Amino acid sequence: MNSRIFPAAMSAPYAPLQPAVVVHDEQGRLYSAAYGDVYHSRDDAAGQAEHVFLRGNGLPQRWRGRARFTVCETGFGMGLNFLTLWQAWRDDPARPRRLHMLSLEGHPFAREDLLAVLRAHAPAGLQALATQLAAQWPPLLPGLHRLEFEGGALTLTLGFGAAQQLAPRLTARVDAYFLDGFAPRGNPAMWDPHMLQALARLAAPDATLASWCSAGQVRQALQQAGFAVRRAPGFGGKWHMTLGQRLPGVATPDDAPDDDGAPVLVVGAGLAGAAVAHALALRGRAVTVLDAARLAGLASHAGHAAAALTPVIARDDNPRARLSRAGSQRAWLRWRDLPAPAAPRRCGTVQLERDAGRAAALAQTLQILQFPADWVRMVDRDQAGALAGLPVARGGVFFADGMLVRPGALIDALLAGEGISTIAAQAARLRRHGAQWQVLDAQGRQVAQAPVVVLANAADAPRLLADSGLLEPLPRLARMHALAGEVTLLPAEALSGGPRCVVGGEGYLLPAVDGWCVAGSTYVHGAAQALTGAEGQRVNLDKAAGLLGQAPAAFASLQPGSLPGWAGWRAVLPGRLPAAGPLAHAPGLWLAAGYASRGLSWAALMGDVIAARLCGEPGPLETDLLAQIAPR
């Protein structure tokens, strides 16, 4: 099991994603005007996928008897290689338990276009799989997108953006390469030696490659990247294709998976801990969760009726914006199938701007980013009010993926997963004993032990590490502080039933849950306790009033101090980004903490970041983002 800390990568200038356009040539083949080339063979596209990429990599024979197998592809296109691979995996009774595909695509199709081209070009035997692929197809946003099929046994990690920028930022242990993409004459960047070397660094010791392209400069670049290459008979009208085998002695990825499937101990039963436990349990790991709140007969987020999950955007698409975008996508895909009331409600968020100047700057930001309008768009005051179902003070932006979440119900559902057990205990100290980490209580008694321990205990994590003599190498974590805050429950009838979507800005107002609308929130520095009270309710009522264009008369009659609410703590780190990953100085210890006010945005993503690295999967985040969140 590896605890490598990823170095920060230099940020490339932001370039908006340019979707593919559906064009056919005179022979009815799908064609790219940008690259002057067709998407598939003149003969049989699925036949080429099987001949070149499956047989060329010795599949399905090479994957038999393995626990996992990972494929890396350049040029996803319309996805026929993926669908052919998926079908071959389904048809093989000796298939690996888990199959992962990592595929890069600079110009992805929109969902409707993808479905249309697959309906037109995929064989009848792949149509059912094509429908499943289109159903999960992500919005056209730059970065990595993780899709799951077959109950999570098959994953597809899509990298949307320039391959030469994404390739150096991938984490995986690749067993087979499908080198596809348009011809080098029209798309030289896809076959650039530096790009191929960036992919080759991911190769497992016995990795193979196959490509329809047999150009001499491509074969030479692959040889320089550490592969023994040869030509083989091509498919259809092509005389040759290229096959390759990783040369012995060449450096291989140091992200070796934790193959023994050892149990994992998670310290903390809040949102961070529940999400880590859930992600690991979905992969078949046995997980024990230590829940300190249960010692006092409490439940995490008890009384917290509802919270919002809204992405953020930035003109330079900075790490916080990228992580937020990835986190909101991951949360929806991970939680949408949970039973009610745990499943999020995708109601959207109207985020109001403070003034006309900020609104103009935001409009310019959206023009630069060129994100899909069905993901985020500008709205004026009337449009915002129509979306919210009540008058609002200003216009702003509408995030279609904004969600309403019931935190307590979500945590309960995550911890109820098969393979997860919970112990009511407080972790006072950690102690290394052989290959195990032992958790001790305040009396020095062992509470639990495991070879892998994930600290997801929010602002108590620095204290636990300090008392265990493990905090000194983590100066950023040592600066974590707890910030109190409260939300207030407003009767929905005082708000004409409440908004239909999340309304945010200077504060937020949420749609009704069980007759109450949550308004928030306060930030109390230096508090000894997290409490509700008249002053906090006054702040939240003022924030709610500032969001509303014309508050109903019943709202004006609400009195601070007379309303129910909930108070809690935020664990805040410098930079307000979370910390998730292994502790380099303490092998076997991992951290998932510092989620501040964005626990819902970070939880599912950080859980999958940790679980993917423990289980030898392609990473769901780029290495420059992993460096930003690495515990330090």
Curated annotation (Swiss-Prot):
Iron-sulfur listed as a keyword: no
Keywords: Cytoplasm, FAD, Flavoprotein, Methyltransferase, Multifunctional enzyme, Oxidoreductase, S-adenosyl-L-methionine, Transferase, tRNA processing
MF term (GO), any: flavin adenine dinucleotide binding
Region ranges (tRNA (mnm(5)s(2)U34)-methyltransferase): 1-247
Span list, region FAD-dependent cmnm(5)s(2)U34 oxidoreductase: 267-632
Any one annotated GO CC term: cytoplasm
Cofactor(s) required for function per UniProt: FAD
Protein name (record): tRNA 5-methylaminomethyl-2-thiouridine biosynthesis bifunctional protein MnmC
Provenance organism: Bordetella bronchiseptica (strain ATCC BAA-588 / NCTC 13252 / RB50) (Alcaligenes bronchisepticus)
Gene coding for it: mnmC
